[in-house]
Curated annotation (Swiss-Prot):
The keyword Nucleotide-binding is annotated on this UniProt entry: no
Matching Pfam families: Ribosomal_S2
Protein name: Small ribosomal subunit protein uS2c
Gene that this polypeptide is encoded by: rps2
Family that this chain belongs to: Belongs to the universal ribosomal protein uS2 family.
Cellular-component GO terms for this entry: chloroplast; small ribosomal subunit
């Protein structure tokens, strides 16, 4: 895999608060190699290490995108949801930003059935068929459609399990991460000072609570994916 330059700037990361970790009492000792200091009761992440692993992650997603691979971005907590949707739409990736339904990947046949139902209901709504049903039936199906849109709207075009999964918060998305591990799907994970860096294929030491930090990391990954997709289009 060729290494590239991704314009990862330490000062920019500091301004975004990427280096701020959790309180020193809430930490995972496995993160010790990625922590540079303690300040006012919180751990400070070593941004040189962050830059290194973020660059590796960008190389990985560029290479995968240049070969037409598919990505899933997962981040369901309120601080991450908007950034996840924005990043996924920009890079034409699938995403989950409301709630991870258990078995979404490991029980793909069930997810696929739900997606077929979702597409059918969307088509019925688009063609006006729902409005021609009895009011009670129409209301029930519209509620079902709304629920499916909330939980599956970001993966409505997904036809199989993704090739790479990007996870914003390891603790919040632990179920998703375990499913990826079970299926052998490579993962890239924002890893705060209370996380286990060994669980992901590439762990990016970073603040996973600040919107500015989440957005900066996703922005770099999205740029690399878009560059890779452009390469794939030019050289199919």
């Amino acid at each position: 895999m060729t290494r590239r330059y991704w314009n990862i700037n330490l000062e920019e990361m500091m301004e975004a608060g990427v280096h701020f970790g959790h309180g020193t009492r809430k930490w995972n000792p496995k993160m010790a190699p990625y922590i540079s200091a303690k300040r006012k009761g919180i751990h400070i992440t070593n941004l040189t290490r962050t830059a290194r692993f973020l660059s590796e992650a960008c190389d990985l997603v560029f290479d995968a995108a240049s070969r037409g691979k598919q990505f899933l971005i997962v981040g369901t907590k309120n601080k991450a949801a908007d950034s996840v949707e924005w990043a996924a739409i920009r890079a034409r990736c699938h995403y989950v930003n409301k709630k991870w339904l258990g078995g979404m990947l490991t029980n793909w046949s069930t997810t696929e059935t739900r997606l077929h139902k979702f597409r059918d209901l969307r088509m019925e709504q688009k063609t006006g068929r729902l409005n021609r049903l009895p009011k009670r039936d129409a209301a029930m199906l519209k509620r079902q459609l709304s629920r499916l849109q909330t939980y599956l709207g970001g993966i409505k075009y997904m036809t199989g399990v993704p090739d790479i999964v990007i996870i914003v918060d390891q603790h919040e998305e632990y179920t998703a991460l375990r499913e990826c591990i079970t299926l052998g799907i490579p993962t890239i994970c924002l890893t705060d000072t209370n996380c286990d860096p060994d669980l992901a294929d590439i762990s990016i030491p970073a603040n996973d609570d600040a919107i500015s930090s989440i957005r900066l990391i996703l922005n770099k990954l999205v740029f690399a994916i878009c560059e890779g997709r452009s390469s794939y289009i030019r050289n199919p």
